[in-house]
């Protein structure tokens, strides 16, 4: 609930959630981003972001902006977690908090997780099959894991 309230502008100062007396600066992705849509659906429950949120064109821009702005908050995908910014633990129920990690995403204790899919034209299935087979192979799954994504196998 607190994340929703921050990103919707109901909570505007960190002291409202037990932090320092500092204005919260909200960074989000641009509206064409799948991450923007997912966060809006899952965290904001399809309600609008606060009008003063600062829209960033890429994940790297969010990390850079949050790392350089006191009181800032933003969101990035698990594969893009950076030591330049502090990640926060999140809870389904306000009692049991989980940090963003491969383990918490896999065991579903971290509540903000979405699947990613590959889509291709059926007419190209013969040409795409070797790529799909490689992605699903142990070597492909290892590359996915090393890239910070959760393998399907």
Task: Give names to the regions the model predicted.
Residues 1-153:
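Exported/periplasmic ABC-transporter solute-binding proteins
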């Amino acid at each position: 609930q607190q994340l929703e309230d921050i990103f919707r502008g109901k909570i505007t100062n960190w002291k409202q959630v037990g932090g320092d007396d500092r204005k919260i600066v909200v960074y989000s992705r641009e509206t064409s981003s799948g991450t923007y849509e997912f966060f809006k659906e899952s965290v904001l429950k399809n309600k609008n972001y606060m009008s003063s949120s600062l829209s960033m064109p890429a994940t790297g821009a969010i990390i850079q902006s949050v790392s350089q702005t006191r009181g800032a908050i933003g969101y990035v995908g698990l594969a893009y977690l950076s030591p330049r910014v502090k990640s926060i633990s999140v809870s389904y129920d306000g009692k049991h908090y989980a940090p963003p990690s491969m383990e918490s995403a896999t065991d579903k204790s971290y509540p903000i997780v979405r699947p990613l899919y590959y889509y291709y034209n059926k007419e190209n299935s013969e040409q795409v099959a070797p790529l799909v087979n490689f992605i699903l192979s142990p070597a492909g799954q290892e590359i996915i894991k090393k890239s910070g994504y959760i393998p399907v196998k």
